[in-house]
């Protein structure tokens, strides 16, 4: 395929994002031609993806595949807090560091956080958001992850940051959480839930959120008209980078909320263009650190795979084939 041939070194280009953007614009035509001769290959990819469903056991396995590449690897191209989600830019001139801090601030203000709040974070990452919220907004935080690598790093972060004593860190699946919280936040963890588990996820959030509480969900989405087709196949990202991952549908999120919960959407902000800028900075930093990536034991194919992955995602956001949203939910009292 297109991505595989780049990874294998069969072709190269000085502007990979431009090439992938062109491919995205012609995606429907490419898919029609592919259907004529690659049904068996597509079925094999779909079956492989189905084998990576996000059950309790499957979720841990899928998360480990991606995030347990090692913290030293991610330090090479992420900001100092290791935020692995879209930043928030006031202008294209913003640094990655300042844009990630702006994202944390933006989310905290949307949630109206204060010292009176007990916030649940579903998906700790490397602890950057929880550390920021505890230090700057004074709230108590319970945060959970299922990645051992991220858990161990976040523990070290919380032990040294101001307000870290207000943070409780768990190594637990969201389905097993207990208690109730004033606010909930989940930043780009939802892609690891999977469409078949929407009701289970939102039922858990509904149970964990106090009456009159609010929740912010930040997630990557795909065009609504592409969603049904997207679910029926696997793709390059899910095959090589994120097993078990699925982009979200805002429409299906709304249906799940109505079907299974007392939660309702009261605000939505599309920040897809911010993700394109974030990915561009990640990609440039990754390429600048190529020598250090190799020193960690990764080969040339791995380098090209990650270059393609970052360019592929950036192109998708720039063409608005995929996007990123922050959804505010309220729970009826």
Go through the PLM ranges and name each one.
Residues 1-78:
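N-terminal auxiliary segments of SAM/dcSAM-dependent transferases
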Residues 115-125:
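Conserved class I S-adenosyl-L-methionine
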Residues 126-137:
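Conserved SAM-binding loop of SAM-dependent methyltransferases across substrates and taxa
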Residues 154-155:
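Conserved SAM-binding loop
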Residues 199-211:
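A short glycine-rich, Lys/Arg-flanked "PGG" loop and its adjoining helix->strand segment in the class I
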Residues 212-220:
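Conserved beta-strand signature within the Rossmann-like core of class I S-adenosyl-L-methionine
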């Amino acid at each position: 395929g297109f991505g595989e041939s780049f990874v294998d070194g069969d072709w190269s280009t000085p502007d990979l994002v431009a090439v992938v953007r062109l491919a995205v614009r012609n995606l429907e035509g490419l898919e029609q031609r592919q259907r004529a001769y690659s049904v068996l290959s597509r079925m094999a990819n779909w079956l492989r993806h189905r084998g990576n469903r996000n059950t309790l056991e499957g979720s841990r396995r899928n998360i480990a595949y991606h995030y347990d590449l090692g913290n030293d690897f991610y330090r090479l191209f992420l900001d100092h807090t290791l935020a692995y989600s879209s930043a928030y830019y006031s202008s294209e001139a913003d640094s990655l560091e300042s844009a990630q801090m702006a994202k944390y601030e933006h989310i905290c203000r949307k949630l109206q956080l204060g010292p009176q709040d007990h916030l649940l974070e579903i998906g700790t990452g490397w602890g950057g958001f929880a550390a920021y919220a505890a230090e700057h907004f004074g709230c108590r935080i319970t945060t959970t992850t299922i990645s051992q690598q991220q858990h161990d790093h976040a523990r070290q972060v919380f032990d040294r940051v101001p307000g870290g004593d207000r943070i409780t860190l768990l190594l637990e699946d969201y389905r097993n959480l207990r208690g109730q919280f004033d606010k909930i936040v989940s930043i780009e963890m939802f892609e690891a839930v999977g469409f078949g588990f929407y009701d289970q996820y939102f039922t858990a959030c509904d149970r964990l959120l106090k009456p009159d509480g609010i929740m912010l969900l930040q997630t990557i989405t795909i065009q609504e008209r592409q969603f049904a087709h997207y679910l029926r196949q696997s793709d390059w990202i899910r095959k090589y980078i994120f097993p078990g991952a699925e982009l979200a549908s805002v429409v299906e999120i709304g249906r799940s909320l109505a079907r299974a919960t007392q939660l309702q959407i009261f605000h939505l902000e599309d920040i897809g263009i911010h993700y394109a800028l974030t990915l561009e900075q990640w990609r440039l930093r990754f390429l600048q650190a190529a020598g250090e990536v190799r020193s960690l034991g990764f080969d040339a194919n791995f380098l090209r795979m990650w270059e393609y992955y970052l360019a592929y995602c950036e192109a998708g956001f720039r063409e608005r084939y995929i996007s990123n949203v922050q959804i505010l939910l309220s729970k009826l009292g």
